[in-house]
Amino acid sequence: MWILIYLFIIWSSLRTWVTAVDSTTTVGDDLNETVSASVWPTMSPQMTVAFRSQRDVMGNLTIDQLPYVGLNLRRVLLNNETSMVNEGNNTRLLTLFKSMLSSEANAFVLDLEQYNNDLRVVDTTLLFSDVLIALQSFIFSTQNNLYANIIVLLLNISAPELDSTEYRHQNQTLNTTYILDKNLGNGFIYKPTDLQSDRAKNNTWNIYGKSSIDGWPTLGSVLYEQKKRLVIGELTDFFNETTAPYIFPHDVFHYEQGNSTLDCPSTVEGLTDLSSIHWRFLDSLFNSVDIKEYISCGLSPIISNSAYVNNVTQLADIIHEGSVWSWDSDQPSVTQSTSKSGSSSGTLEAYNCVLLYYFANNETVTWRVGNCYNSNIGLCRYENMAFRWLVRSNKATYFDFDSYQGSKCPDQYSFNIPRSPLEQRSFIAYMRNSSFSDTQIWIDLNSISVSNCWVSGGPYASCPYEKVISKRNFVTMMVPASVCSFALLCIVVYLSVLRVPIYDNRKNWRRVINKISKSELEGVPS
């Protein structure tokens, strides 16, 4: 019986241990997991964490207001300077395209032409279906909360040289729905019908709040609830709603080439007006300096630098400068634990909270990791107003600035963070108008729960990639169970080895009992 109890205890402890290990997602271990990129430079663990945390911060932004960094594939990949095009090396072209998908680029302009009731990539023998198969493979390999992101595919369709009757006939016989269903699958595509459904359910927003007329769903809704990964749009006027129901028409997107006609806003009114324009793309030549400025002005750059096709590293640097608009160049620091420690001066240290550094001389900001136990001022936002900020003058540690006991932000304000380049630009305008000098400000972003998992929601926010328990709490949970198991084991061993004394002296007890029984009288007393 004791053996069975002991085995049950051991089984329970092992089950708890296995459950905890299986349920814990250590984000640091996932830093080394990268999508296959045989040509494109692999993202470092630091870049991976920065890009992922930035995506998570933008989770409540609508997909039309996200900052995309894209590539014009015909100019970058398929220009005349590319020997691959002249050689007709389709395999290498697809390999490079797959590598580009695994970079930080998340928008692509693809030029297609009609070819025998099919679509073919201009200046190549590649079919549109070949590109879709490569895209499907990438989406399958990244269909999880760690790596999933929205991809925008913008199509330039070249019409065949036919008279109007033949053109209209070929356009109607071209079955784009079949091509997309067969080679990609419609489950990953966010379609015009999905947008209509979201608007009917009042699940869309614009800059002013919920809107069923011109609103769009949030990134979190599209990625995690609907499991959609791809938005396909047309830049020409080749398709219609009947022939291409999966593709958004050209008038949905604000797409410009060369120079932008949109002014870079510097006031809240200008920022609000710009935000009312959906999907703002600028197709032009960029370098690693000016691309950050265009991003901060609310535009999504489409890189058309044909000279960089043979210098992939330089092109990758430009994409990185544009895609990471928040963190400093050497941030965030990749750590292995979140446990607090004491410095030589006796103060507590936990470098798991984020400070926004404001530099007044050039009016720039950047994010850096700071010690959560240091006292700093914090950033507050007014209700759901995207561009209305307040910096509190009273200093506090990260844990005290926004805690269960209350927030340091006043009523109708909440501890917050700039979620996009435009919101960060509005914050800079606020700091300039308020005549702030260089300063460091707490923002609502930390990795207190799990190392390298940067989340918003205050110091007690949990990591979305960790289901049950973290490494830090694992030892705390296992120690009591292990001690109890060891104590019960000792008791079981003791009872199994050491017999009860009455059985140990059985002969002596029998002799005593016999002696006593002889002195007893038999029969009934008279």
From Swiss-Prot:
GO cellular component: membrane
Identification of the protein by name: Maintenance of telomere capping protein 6
Biological function: May be involved in telomere capping.
Membrane-spanning segments: 478-498
Location of this chain's protein in the cell: Membrane
Major localisation: membrane
Lineage: Eukaryota, Fungi, Dikarya, Ascomycota, Saccharomycotina
Coiled coil: none
Family: Belongs to the MTC6 family.
Residues the record marks as carrying a glycan: 32, 60, 80, 89, 156, 171, 175, 202, 240, 259, 311, 362, 433
Signal peptide interval: 1-20
Topological category with respect to the lipid bilayer: Single-pass type I membrane protein
Cytoplasmic-side positions: 499-526
Keyword annotations: Glycoprotein, Membrane, Signal, Transmembrane, Transmembrane helix
Record topology, Extracellular segments: 21-477
Highest taxon in the source lineage: Eukaryota
